[in-house]
Amino acid sequence: KNVAYDVNDADVQVILLVEDSRRFYSAYLPLLYTQLVKQTVRLMGEGGNLDEKLLRLRARAKILLATDMQSARSIIDRYHNNIIGVFTDGKFPNLGSSRDTAGLELVKFIQSRHSNTPILFQSKNLELKEEAESLGVRFLHKEDTALYKRIAEFMVDKMGFGDFIFRSKEGEEVARASTLTE
């Protein structure tokens, strides 16, 4: 309910999860939320009073769930400037087009508008891996025993959920900060 207000007035960021399997989104949502809260708490550090900390916690990124192509595109069109990452299934309802390749179609849709958006493509269908990776997105098999660990790693590596790393023009790390006060 508050997403439109938070994005428009407070410039809050958005993470999009595209998944039609209740089993998987019921597992992913708590994982994503836990990572968000950990990142927010880590960034807050020790400074600030309780009101400031509560405000920062409220301003954390919002996770939006889409269970079909139309919902996913609507969210992307509406919040495109604030999307910091997309987690998409390979197969989900896609009115008028193939359900089996909906995830690939969504990746192409996102990249045609926002080429730098980090995208994690997950599927049980290993046949989609090569094409997903050829589009420059990370592929995870949904039955990987380390799936949740790899999702958390993706958030750190690609979405900035880790230390702030300052690099030289050559790409070498010159400094690192774990909190805003560092």
Model-predicted regions and their roles:
Residues 1, 86-87, 105-133, 137-140:
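A short, hydrophobic beta-strand element within the central beta-sheet of small alpha/beta folds
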Residues 2-30, 159-182:
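CheY-like receiver
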Residues 11-23, 28-52, 63-65:
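Conserved acidic segment of CheY-like receiver
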Residues 43-85:
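Acidic, metal-coordinating helix/loop segments flanking the phosphotransfer/catalytic sites
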Residues 64-67, 139-146:
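Short acidic-hydrophobic, aromatic-tinged amphipathic segments that line or gate anion-handling sites
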